[in-house]
Amino acid sequence: MDKHLLETTVSKVLDEMRERPIPLGVSNRHIHLSAEDYARLFPGRPISEKKALLQPGQYAAEQTVTLAGPKGELKNVRLLGPLRSTSQVEISRTDARTLGIAAPLRMSGDLKGTPGIRLISPFAEITLASGVIVAQRHIHMSPLDALILRVTHGDSVCVAIEGTGRRLIFDNVAVRVSPDMRLEMHIDTDEANAAGADAPGAFATLAAPR
């Protein structure tokens, strides 16, 4: 195969790979707990896996808590594992109104200046001084995915939600690149409802900014 034909073939393959669907992950309200906070809420009870998530090593746990805010409560909020260094609560704007909490839009882990909340388990309750956020929509990917899609960690991209009958483009989608991540876009339930992302054929693709 001559050089020009090889380059043309490689370019075509890469173009096709760039157009492949990006899996959608709809994040319902959930919590991450530090080992210390977990031990206080579930004393003497090890965290147990209920269902593996797409991202390697991450899972939905059997354990749930109630979120209690100034105006209301949300019950059966799932704990995601493994345990982290700092506790964090991720909710939607709709959830924030139910709870009466002014949760800011943040990337996971960016918790400075965030409001706190009361967590209630079947065994105990604690109050977090901070840690409640509305998660910024984002795409997880490996370095190879980033190379194919021509993006880098920290980029902000536009993404179209397709296959729903009500195509919707989201801008300000953060790119998160890590060697141990698999390609997946994360949106919350408010965003998913707006896009009809619960449709069986729903998927995401990178879109050109307007």
From Swiss-Prot:
Involved in 1,2-propanediol (1,2-PD) utilization within the bacterial microcompartment (BMC) dedicated to 1,2-PD degradation by catalyzing the conversion of propanoyl-CoA to propanoyl-phosphate. This is Phosphate propanoyltransferase. There are 2 Zn(2+) ions per monomer; Zn(2+) and CoA bind inbetween the 2 domains in each monomer. Belongs to the PduL family. It catalyses: propanoyl-CoA + phosphate = propanoyl phosphate + CoA. The gene is pduL. One of its GO terms (molecular function) is acyltransferase activity, transferring groups other than amino-acyl groups. NCBIfam families: PRK15070.1. Its cofactor is Zn(2+). Formed by 2 beta-barrels, each is capped on both ends by short alpha-helices. Pathway: Polyol metabolism; 1,2-propanediol degradation. Phosphate binds at R84.
